């Protein structure tokens, strides 16, 4: 249930930078989005002047972008709101190689797979950046300039400008060299390809700023150095911090899995719940990075966290805003309505969007049953009770509900009162929920 293109454009038009800051650079600093950069004074002056062209790259090493990429997309959008023109680079060539991981060699994906993922990422990038006005986003693919290059031309025209000693000092390369696995020439050459990207965008479109994660700093500066050597030009780079949770756990993971921007991989319901579960110690920092709320509103929410943390107002606002950004306002509204109905806080389960409710139940303990299976058995199958005898006692004590109605008969078939889509919501006590998907022939 994503928004239509017109509604998505309305959402983009409603976004704005905080007018309490004189310069977008100051706002980026306040939001905690600058970890490392080239000359800060020069960057601040550059961003306060005439519009510039800038870019960020996204490699198609998976079928979808994830929350780490969202940091870059929203940073790009803030610069666009300040009048600067974004170029979204989807790495059709660099995605065939993959940047070196500190631990092990990447598995190379098939060219056909990478080409398919390029299309998926292009669509995702365009959701977050405006295609209207003089500074409309433009998408580029680095395969367009690397594919025509012969190996000899690549080595003569680009490779000769890179010093091996400097390349060996890059963090990921150094880590791999000190490991048992080592590093292949394929991955070692990645930083040259990314440097070439910046050079081409500098030549073709006048790009003078590249943004990316701070873990990519060596690759970012390979481009600024290449531009200096080849063109005698001056270009900049900004590295955003790698976000971690206050308890030291890795940000952007849910049950050990990445939180993806594609609803087929991470449902809007799962996205909403991920943000709703943000710790009090982290929520204000997340609001700064992942929403367009202005400083006065974030400071108000910070006071609310300190004075009335049990209300979780900041978490609810964070979950609403990010889910709306990623999946659209309609999907966010459907998720909230389904959550309220699921947990008995209002709303009729039968009136909820079927796909949203199904995705919510898949996040809970659930089972697939035939229509004739007894509710008592479904309680055991979903883990709400450990045995049939415990299930019968729970029903006899009035402690079990199905679709928010108290269950009177433990032997009643699950197929007797289904929601649209063949679903049953079981509840034991006030808060323990499970789902049953009823199918013929199971």
Swiss-Prot record:
It catalyses: tRNA(Tyr) + L-tyrosine + ATP = L-tyrosyl-tRNA(Tyr) + AMP + diphosphate + H(+). It is found in: Cytoplasm. GO terms for cellular component: cytosol. The keyword Ligase applies. Keywords: Aminoacyl-tRNA synthetase, ATP-binding, Cytoplasm, Ligase, Nucleotide-binding, Protein biosynthesis, RNA-binding. GO terms for biological process: tyrosyl-tRNA aminoacylation. It is an enzyme of class 6 (ligase). ATP binds at residue 253. L-tyrosine binds at residues 55, 190, 194. The keyword Aminoacyl-tRNA synthetase applies. Its EC number is 6.1.1.1. A motif ('KMSKS' region) lies at residues 250-254. Disulfide bonds: none annotated. A motif ('HIGH' region) lies at residues 60-69. InterPro entries: aa-tRNA-synth_I_CS, aa-tRNA-synth_Ic, Rossmann-like_a/b/a_fold, S4_RNA-bd_sf, SYY-like_C, Tyr-tRNA-ligase, Tyr-tRNA-ligase_bac-type, Tyr-tRNA-ligase_bac_1. One of its GO terms (molecular function) is ATP binding. Coiled coil: none annotated. Catalyzes the attachment of tyrosine to tRNA(Tyr) in a two-step reaction: tyrosine is first activated by ATP to form Tyr-AMP and then transferred to the acceptor end of tRNA(Tyr). Belongs to the class-I aminoacyl-tRNA synthetase family. TyrS type 1 subfamily. This is Tyrosine--tRNA ligase. It comes from Leifsonia xyli subsp. xyli (strain CTCB07). The lineage of its organism: Bacteria, Bacillati, Actinomycetota, Actinomycetes, Micrococcales.
């Amino acid at each position: 249930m994503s928004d239509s293109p017109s509604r998505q454009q309305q959402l983009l038009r409603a976004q704005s930078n905080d007018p309490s800051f004189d310069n977008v650079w100051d706002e980026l600093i306040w939001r905690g989005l600058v970890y490392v950069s080239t000359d800060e004074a020069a960057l601040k002056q550059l961003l306060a002047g005439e519009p510039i062209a800038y870019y960020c790259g996204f490699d198609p090493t998976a079928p979808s972008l994830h929350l780490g990429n969202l940091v870059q997309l929203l940073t790009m959008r803030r610069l666009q709101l300040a009048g600067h023109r974004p170029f979204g680079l989807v790495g059709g060539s660099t995605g065939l190689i993959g940047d070196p991981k500190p631990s092990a060699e990447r598995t190379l994906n098939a060219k056909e797979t990478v080409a398919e993922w390029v299309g998926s990422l292009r669509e995702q990038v365009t959701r977050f950046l405006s295609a209207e006005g003089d500074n409309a986003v433009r998408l580029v693919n680095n395969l367009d300039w690397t594919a025509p290059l012969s190996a000899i031309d690549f080595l003569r025209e680009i490779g000769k400008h890179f010093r091996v000693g400097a390349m060996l000092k890059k963090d990921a390369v150094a880590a791999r060299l000190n490991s048992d696995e080592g590093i292949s020439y394929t991955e070692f050459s990645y930083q040259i390809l990314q440097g070439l990207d910046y050079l081409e965008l500098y030549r073709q479109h006048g790009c003078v700023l590249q943004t990316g994660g701070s873990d990519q700093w060596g690759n970012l500066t390979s481009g600024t150095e290449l531009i200096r050597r080849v063109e005698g030009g001056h270009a900049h780079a900004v590295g955003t911090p790698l976000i971690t949770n206050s308890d030291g756990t890795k940000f952007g993971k849910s049950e050990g899995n990445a939180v993806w921007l594609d609803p087929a991989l991470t449902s809007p319901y799962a996205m909403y719940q991920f943000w709703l579960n943000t710790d009090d110690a982290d929520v204000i920092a997340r609001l700064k990075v992942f929403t367009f709320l202005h400083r006065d509103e974030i400071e108000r929410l910070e006071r609310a966290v300190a004075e009335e943390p049990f209300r979780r107002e900041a978490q609810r606002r964070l979950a609403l805003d990010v889910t709306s950004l990623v999946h659209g306002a309609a999907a966010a509204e459907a998720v909230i309505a389904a959550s309220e109905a699921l947990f008995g806080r209002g709303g009729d389960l039968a009136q909820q969007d079927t796909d949203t409710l199904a995705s919510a139940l898949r996040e809970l303990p659930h089972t697939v049953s035939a229509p004739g299976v007894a509710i008592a058995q479904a309680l055991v199958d979903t883990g709400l009770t450990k045995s049939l005898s415990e299930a019968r006692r729970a029903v006899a004590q009035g402690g079990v509900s199905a679709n928010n109605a108290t269950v009177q008969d433990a032997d009643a078939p699950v197929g007797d009162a289904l929601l649209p889509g063949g679903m049953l919501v079981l509840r034991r006590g006030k808060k323990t929920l499970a789902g049953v998907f009823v199918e013929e022939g199971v």
